[in-house]
Amino acid sequence: MLKKTITYTDYNGMERTEDFYFHLSKAELMEMEMSTTGGMEAYVEKIVNAQDAPAIVQTFKELILKAYGEKSLDGKRFEKSPEKADAFAQTEAYSELF
């Protein structure tokens, strides 16, 4: 799990510093690897070598949003959902990270 502290200005003009969490489980990594022709590592290498900016940006965005989540209060779960990822993507913290 990666904890990233991000300082950003919210839409009320208030500067905020918050911790955000990102994690891809072994199962998620395996799924990404197996669902990408030739594997995820080879795909990333290919688009970087080709300097395919649109594909690089799209892949980076997908990785960030797929990894974003919130730790449960008891620390036993890392809670993810499309709604949580979408809410994060609508913040200036996401823009700062991106």
What function would you assign to each model-found segment?
Residues 1-43:
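Short, charged/polar N-terminal "headpieces" of proteins
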Residues 41-98:
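Acidic, low-complexity intrinsically disordered segments
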